[in-house]
Amino acid sequence: MLRVVLDTNLFVSSILVTVGLPAQALDAWRRQKYLMIISPALIVEVRHTLAYPRIRRKYAITDEKVDQLVSLLEQRAIVVPGAADVTGAIPADPKDEIILACAVDGQANLIVSGDQHLLALGAYQGIPILPVREFLEQLAAS
């Protein structure tokens, strides 16, 4: 089964817009179509991003909804340390390196992202980086 790291922006988008492609990617994981790899740093980033007051107001995000997502991730995803040294891999946006570290530590087959800095890499240490649409097409074809 595919081992996949989803970028934080996809988690956030799937909560904010429940009918889009990011929501479909998360739903495919819930239906056990692939294994999700995640690190504690990515979980913290998801929680932190969903705590922004402007997001909370605009999308009526509650602590309960965030807690449910985090709990699901902690219980069903494969949690890896995300401590691989990937320093300098994304000079334009080093904070995105936590996604690469997670993928390397978790021996991921694929990284899925909407982030242009990550997508521009194309792959990292042999791990392809795809936009969500391509990922869903690949998943449907398998």
Question: How should these model regions be labeled?
Answer:
Residues 62-64, 71, 81-83, 87-92, ...:
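Internal alpha/beta domain cores that form substrate/cofactor-binding pockets in large enzymes
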Residues 104-112, 116-142:
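Acidic, PIN/NYN-like endoribonuclease modules and their adjacent C-terminal/linker elements
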Residues 1-38:
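Short, well-structured N-terminal submotif of metal-dependent ribonuclease cores
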Residues 14-15, 49, 58, 121, ...:
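Residues that scaffold the ATP/ADP-binding catalytic core of kinase and kinase-like folds
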Residues 6-8, 38-39, 114-115, 131-132:
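A secondary-structure boundary/capping signal
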Residues 20, 37, 64, 90, ...:
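Residues at secondary-structure transition points
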Residues 28-85:
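PIN-domain endoribonuclease scaffold, especially VapC-family toxins
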Residues 74-110:
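Active-site neighborhoods of divalent-metal-dependent phosphate/nucleic-acid chemistry enzymes
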